[in-house]
Amino acid sequence: MAEYLASIFGTEKDKVNCSFYFKIGACRHGDRCSRLHNKPTFSQTIALLNIYRNPQNSSQSADGLRCAVSDVEMQEHYDEFFEEVFTEMEEKYGEVEEMNVCDNLGDHLVGNVYVKFRREEDAEKAVIDLNNRWFNGQPIHAELSPVTDFREACCRQYEMGECTRGGFCNFMHLKPISRELRRELYGRRRKKHRSRSRSRERRSRSRDRGRGGGGGGGGGGGGRERDRRRSRDRERSGRF
């Protein structure tokens, strides 16, 4: 019996635990759900609830008419948001393996951002700190999420352009970033690892030669890059 219960845990056959919450970390019934939402006590993944505001869903003029937002403007706005959050997570809390943003319209998924860290300790640290912070004038609601495999959480029909439920689908509709930004963010991490390795080699050679300043050039470049990034960030509307 115990083996059977373990085998169906989190599936639709499980009459006790909510399969949607287990797969997606969110359920449209919320606290009213008849099944249990087992919130994890440890996880690599955190959820920042309802933090992304899609201008195409919310932009209205003073007379209540909807303002047109071009696809180019929309992508630029989204890329800026994604880069700001991704950079903040890595610089303050730890290495990010994956970050995803929901483009759904249902209250339980709209604007949710899922950040999967390499280490569970970093995820725990992030949740504790973020719940005392604000973003874009709103308090952040962060929690550990049971989602670790986004392939199970995503709507396959949406990825093929065939989802008939639209924005109110109960599976994740993930909003993609531009290819350029993906290369920059995830490529930057690979460069950082290579840079650290080269920096250690330089410091080792410097110590062998009796000089102590071999690693300073790399740090200065990194500082200038951070300054440029912060300057760009100050121009953005969404601020931590």
UniProtKB/Swiss-Prot annotation:
The keyword Repeat applies. Residues 183-240 are annotated as: Disordered. Its main location: nucleus. GO terms for biological process: mRNA processing; mRNA splicing, via spliceosome; RNA splicing. It is found in: Nucleus; Nucleus speckle. Changing residue 134 to A: Decreases affinity for UAF2 by 3 orders of magnitude. The modification Phosphoserine is found at residues 61, 145. Residues 188-208 have a biased composition (Basic residues). The modification N-acetylalanine is found at residue 2. Residues 223-240 have a biased composition (Basic and acidic residues). CDD domains: RRM_U2AF35. GO terms for cellular component: Cajal body; catalytic step 2 spliceosome; nuclear speck; nucleoplasm; spliceosomal complex; U2AF complex. Belongs to the splicing factor SR family. Identified in the spliceosome C complex. Heterodimer with U2AF2. Interacts (via RS domain) with PHF5A (via N-terminus). Interacts with ZRANB2. Interacts with SDE2. Interacts with SF3B1. It is linked to Myelodysplastic syndrome: A heterogeneous group of closely related clonal hematopoietic disorders. All are characterized by a hypercellular or hypocellular bone marrow with impaired morphology and maturation, dysplasia of the myeloid, megakaryocytic and/or erythroid lineages, and peripheral blood cytopenias resulting from ineffective blood cell production. The C-terminal SR-rich domain is required for interactions with SR proteins and the splicing regulators TRA and TRA2, and the N-terminal domain is required for formation of the U2AF1/U2AF2 heterodimer. Plays a critical role in both constitutive and enhancer-dependent splicing by mediating protein-protein interactions and protein-RNA interactions required for accurate 3'-splice site selection. Recruits U2 snRNP to the branch point. Directly mediates interactions between U2AF2 and proteins bound to the enhancers and thus may function as a bridge between U2AF2 and the enhancer complex to recruit it to the adjacent intron. This is Splicing factor U2AF 35 kDa subunit.
